[in-house]
Amino acid sequence: DGLKKDNFHITLKRTLHDGIKYYQIEELEEALEGADLILGGVSSFGLDWFCDEILPVLPEDVPLLTVTKGMVDLDDGTLVPYPHIFEQRQPEGKHINFNAIGGPCTSYELADHDDSHVAFCGKDMETLKFIKSLLTTDYYHISLSTDVVGVECAVAMKNAYALGVSLAVGLAEKRDGEIGAVHYNSQAALFGQGVKEMIHLLELIHGGPENIIHGAGDLYVTVFGGRTRKIGTLLGRGLTFDQAMEELQGVTLESIVIATRTARAVRKLAERGVVSLDDFPLLMHVDAIINEGA
């Protein structure tokens, strides 16, 4: 209702641009009328709701582009990106054209029309070209890929590793006794280790190695701000996971979900002899902090 009144977004703390129409969820049918493209932007915690309540009413002849980043781990250690989960959970007999966005692009800077580069991925290149033609601007730059697993898993992983890199921020603040203290050497060391482990994970899921550009870029921008940096910093200062979560009460933390699922998948693969846990020291350390009280 506030957006309808004055275009002011209370979370972004910005007045959005003219030409945008706003609808309540009860007005979904009206909003879909004449649409050329549908964008889905729920958090990973809204995945079940989106699958159960929204997918059944979406038209099949309009492509869907989702910004939800995440993976689900299966019993054998396989990591499945959300676009594949959406596809599996659409109503029987329905064939929605699923596509997704990956890459470093914060909502705040996009709202300010800051230059950004992302990847659109999906099964059909012609559909991707059509979507790109609708959304490309002089500040929003788009690459296309049919490697959905590679793109989406790369950008999902970064949430876990951004938490790991942010530990160095909290460690610096604890050592110096100063909030905002910065030590780039330690952050860079963890960043490099994170990218190394992400490359290894991409190999395991058979994602193209070229997709690391999207994951590494997303890792970079996530470390510099946002919810994941906050939780990593608090943990680095020495707070327990429960203490840190209490301080951030009400904040959605997808990094916790991704770190837990990815570590669990790696452990299962290690049990099968596919990988060694020694190849993922940063991921295992993050998992130990958030799930084992380390």
For each predicted feature, which ranges?
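Glycine-rich anion/phosphate-binding loops
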Residues: 44-48, 142-148, 286
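Short, small-residue-enriched loops and turns at beta-alpha junctions
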Residues: 71-74, 151-152, 221, 251
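Conserved residues at beta->alpha junctions
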Residues: 41-42, 122, 290
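Rossmann-like NAD(P)(H) cofactor-binding subdomain of soluble oxidoreductases
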Residues: 16-115, 131
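Glycine-rich phosphate-binding loop and adjoining beta1-alpha1-beta2 segment
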Residues: 1-16
